[in-house]
Amino acid sequence: MRVLQIQAPRKCEIVDRPVPQVQDNEVLVEVKACVTCPHWDITLWTGVDIFERPGYPRYPIPAGFPGHEVSGVVVKIGRAVRNFRTGDRVATLVDGGTESPGFYAEYVSRPEDTVAKLPDFVSYESGASLEMANCLAPFVRRLGNLAGKRVGVTGVGPAGLLAVQMLGAVGAAEVVAMDVLPERLELARKSGATETVNTGTPEGLQALQAKPLQACVDCSGRGAALQTALDHTQGLVAVFGVIHGEAKLSTRHWLQGLSIVTCLPRTPEDTTFMLDMLAAGKLNAEALVSARLPFERYAEGVQLLIDKQAIKVCFYPK
């Protein structure tokens, strides 16, 4: 089968690999759509480690990685599989790990408890982002009862735009989207944000100062944006983005009653929470897909992400 592999910084090839063998508890999925996780794709493509570990990344990257957000059709099931049948439309819920083969491939084999069925009304392009929504779910749930509250999202890239949808779905009275790119703020409004704030302007910061947030999800991955969240939230800040740069705490933050959570593990309850939203039609990730390209144009797609000309890119194996 055809698999995309990053061989070195800014160099990739389509390599041939055997179709995965299906274990008893696994399903074999023919991949129909695979969307980028921009931070991970950009860092591996440019020779930077997303977690800032010494000696990483190590090339060549395992074939198919960092692809981990995919959807497709079940074409084979293991002997112990009970919840799926061939022909089911599914998406992955969990990545395969950084040292394992990734999902930029024609076929992937996954344990049945790490995939979910897609409702008929959900496209492959939208369903491929289920893994990202599953990652967001524990952060949104950790914020607690948001009914009637003013809640923020810093950084409205793909995760931030989904967070806007999720916060609105759980009943936040005001969902404030914050970014420095006007075009991203416009997308956030279309995704359900009740207010948008350009945090790169004095006027934007003044607006937050005048009306602080009661909770916030940081999806930026930037120290400066996290600082904005910390400075203007009187409650819990859930840090979803992998942070690069620094943010500082002071006595003022202590007096605000600020709480911070990071890197939350997912539970079955988180997944159920997210899938219920999907089934109710409250999550739509298709609007996040800015370009659709074959594997052969991977370099072009990642450059769109680097240049901020795309939110997510959907790649097709054939």
Features from the language model and the residues they span:
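NAD(P)H dinucleotide-binding glycine-rich loop of Rossmann-like/cofactor-binding domains
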Residues: 56-63, 68, 83, 92-154
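Short Gly/aromatic-enriched secondary-structure transition segments
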Residues: 42-50
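C-terminal hydrophobic helical "lid"/dimerization subdomain
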Residues: 3, 268-318
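N-terminal Rossmann-like NAD(P) cofactor-binding module of classical short-chain dehydrogenase/reductase
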Residues: 91, 217, 238
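Mid-domain Rossmann-like dinucleotide-binding core that forms the NAD(H)/NADP(H) cofactor-binding site
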Residues: 123-201
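Glycine-rich beta-strand-centered segment in the early N-terminal region that forms part
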Residues: 20-35, 49-96
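Short amphipathic alpha-helix with an adjacent loop that forms part of the alpha/beta core around
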Residues: 201-211
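Glycine-rich phosphate-binding loop and adjacent beta-alpha segment
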Residues: 223-282, 317-318
